[in-house]
């Protein structure tokens, strides 16, 4: 049976404990906690929310987070961080990749099984170019996830809503045809989907078939 939760980004002005209070009060059993860098400069909607600062995750903080879950009887389904690791700016790309790896390590420290993110994309380049970038960037990320036994859930949102995201969007992993190519490159069981059927619906695709076809890759679910 699924546990019902929400993404903590919607409560960006709340403290971590206030997020747990809200979840408990409203009958949720889990929360996906946002872990953007505390010094984050990303300005898009829901970006930049930092409810757990993974750069400051010492033993005292880890114990505090564990106790919050016990106190409010609300678990953490995943840690989330959704940048563009395939950014065409090499320095920015490295910054995103490095922080993704920090969040994966935080999952291990907190005994959280899933880290959710985007594959990323250079919106000005075609799919084949971005596939080649994926081959360069993602093997080391998945190698770390495998080593620490943390599942990576890739959300399938195209991210093409603002001028800077056009024409291709800032997330490559948007359709089953592309998922197949990515899974062929990285067949690891730790590399899967944070599946949101709504993104297939508005792209006029079958949102039900992937639930069956990619059942072993559905590491986390978003619903709208």
Task: For every predicted segment, state its role.
Residues 8-15:
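Short polar catalytic/cofactor-binding loops
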Residues 63-64, 68-75, 84-195, 201-204, ...:
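Active-site acidic/histidine proton-transfer and metal-coordination neighborhood
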Residues 2-8, 29-33, 76-81, 115-117, ...:
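Hydrophobic faces of well-ordered beta-strands that scaffold small-molecule active sites
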Residues 3-6, 49-51, 87-89, 125-127:
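A short, structure-level motif marking secondary-structure boundaries and short turns
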Residues 17-39, 108-113:
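Catalytic domains of carbohydrate-active enzymes, especially glycoside hydrolases
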Residues 32-66, 121, 125:
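Glycine-rich, proline-tolerant flexible connector loops at the mouths of alpha/beta enzymes
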Residues 205-224:
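Aromatic-lined glycan-binding groove of carbohydrate-active enzymes
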């Amino acid at each position: 049976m699924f546990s019902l939760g929400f993404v903590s980004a919607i409560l960006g002005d709340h403290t971590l404990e206030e997020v747990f209070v809200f979840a408990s009060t409203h009958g949720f059993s889990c929360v996906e906690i946002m872990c953007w860098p505390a010094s984050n400069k990303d300005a898009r909607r829901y970006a930049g929310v930092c409810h757990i600062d993974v750069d400051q995750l010492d033993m005292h903080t880890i114990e505090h987070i564990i106790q919050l879950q016990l106190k409010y009887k609300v678990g953490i389904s995943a840690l989330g961080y959704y940048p563009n690791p395939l950014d065409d700016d090499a320095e920015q790309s490295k910054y995103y990749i490095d922080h993704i790896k920090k969040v994966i390590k935080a999952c291990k420290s907190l005994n959280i099984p899933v880290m959710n993110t985007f594959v990323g994309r250079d919106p000005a380049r075609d799919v084949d170019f971005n596939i080649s970038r994926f081959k360069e960037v993602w093997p080391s990320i998945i190698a770390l996830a495998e080593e620490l036994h943390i599942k990576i859930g890739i959300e399938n949102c195209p991210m093409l809503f603002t001028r800077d995201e056009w024409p291709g969007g800032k997330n490559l992993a948007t359709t089953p045809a592309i998922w197949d190519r990515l899974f062929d490159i990285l067949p690891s069981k730790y590399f899967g989907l944070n599946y949101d059927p709504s993104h297939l619906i508005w792209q006029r695709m079958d949102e039900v078939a992937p639930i069956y076809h990619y059942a072993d890759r559905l590491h986390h679910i978003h619903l709208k």
